[in-house]
UniProtKB/Swiss-Prot annotation:
Catalytic activity, reaction form: (6R)-5,10-methylene-5,6,7,8-tetrahydrofolate + NADP(+) = (6R)-5,10-methenyltetrahydrofolate + NADPH; (6R)-5,10-methenyltetrahydrofolate + H2O = (6R)-10-formyltetrahydrofolate + H(+)
E.C. number(s) listed in UniProt: 1.5.1.5, 3.5.4.9
Name the UniProt record assigns to this protein: Bifunctional protein FolD
Gene name as annotated: folD
Gene Ontology MF terms: methenyltetrahydrofolate cyclohydrolase activity; methylenetetrahydrofolate dehydrogenase (NADP+) activity
Length: 294
């Protein structure tokens, strides 16, 4: 068996197209232009690349894009004042503070200062609480992308056995809640779980988000299972360079899985696309409009 490749690049492009069409519709029918504000603190090169990508894709979807760049030594009070200003700006429907923040800034305080209605990263405790209670909420973008990718293989996740390896607040925990809301049967595990291979071998859906290069092996996977690899790890090569791998030993797992996401080209492609989805949903909710068809 050779696994079907779940092409995140193609699926994300289709999702961005759906968002753009919905943005065009709400502009035409309601005079509403969704707006996303991204706050970048410091000059971390990787963060700058991510912010540029978000800006480009936001504009391509027909949304307004607002960038706010602050120095690494900015006072927390100044950052909080900017967030408060964005909270009250009617042209801004989504606020994203690029993480990680420089030392000296309290991430939890900063995230909690964002209006939950504009928290398009889905990290505010209000949204996390609603998600855990099965209520409508803005969900973190990476877990949301995992669900969308899964549904390209299984249009309904109801009744499927799923395992989430990883318990971070950014991916693992919210992914569990999203799966429960889809009526999947969910096991959450982590690097210290006992008999992890045996637990994983029972799952129809495997989500690897533990941050350990190629941890999930072939003999962990039930034949025909769907494997979603959230990991992004750089490992050295024999030539003294590095290469990007996930948390799944891709080549060997692809021989037994029914479907699998590659790294790169899988989950990572979905994150910004889902950010656009959340921004559109937030804009419609704030304006009192029905939930968009995406």
């Amino acid at each position: 068996m050779t696994a079907r490749i779940i092409d995140g690049k193609v699926i994300a492009a289709d999702l961005r197209g759906q968002v753009a069409r919905e943005v065009e519709r709400v502009k035409r029918d309601h005079g509403l232009t969704p707006g996303l504000a991204v706050v970048l603190v410091g000059n971390d090169p990787a963060s700058e690349v991510y912010v540029r990508s978000k800006h480009t894709q936001t504009q391509a979807a027909g949304m307004a894009s607002f960038e706010h760049k602050l120095p690494a030594d900015v006072a927390q009070s100044e950052l909080l004042a900017l967030i408060d200003k964005l909270n009250h700006d009617p042209s801004v429907h989504g606020i994203l503070v690029q993480l990680p923040l420089p030392k000296g800034l309290e991430t939890e305080i900063v995230i909690n200062a964002i209006d939950p209605a504009k928290d398009v990263d889905g990290l505010h405790p209000h949204n996390a609480g609603r998600l855990s209670g099965g209520q409508p909420a803005l969900a973190p973008c990476t877990p949301l992308g995992c669900i969308i990718l899964s549904k390209t293989v299984h249009p309904s996740l109801e009744g499927l056995n799923a395992i989430v390896i990883g318990r971070s607040n950014l991916v693992g925990r919210p992914l569990v809640q999203l799966l429960l809301n889809e009526n999947a049967t969910v096991t959450i595990a982590h690097s210290r779980s006992r008999d992890l291979a045996a637990l994983t071998a029972r799952a129809d859906l495997v989500y690897a988000a533990v941050g350990r290069p190629e941890m999930v092996k072939r003999d962990w996977i039930k034949p025909g299972a769907t494997v979603i690899d959230v990991g992004i790890n750089r490992i050295p090569t024999a030539e003294g360079k590095t290469r990007l791998v996930g948390d799944v030993a891709y080549a060997e797992v692809a021989e037994v899985a029914g479907a699998i996401t590659p790294v790169p080209g899988g989950v990572g492609q979905m994150t910004v696309a889902c950010l656009l989805v959340n921004t559109l949903r937030a804009a419609c909710a704030i304006a009192g409009l029905p939930k968009p068809a995406v």
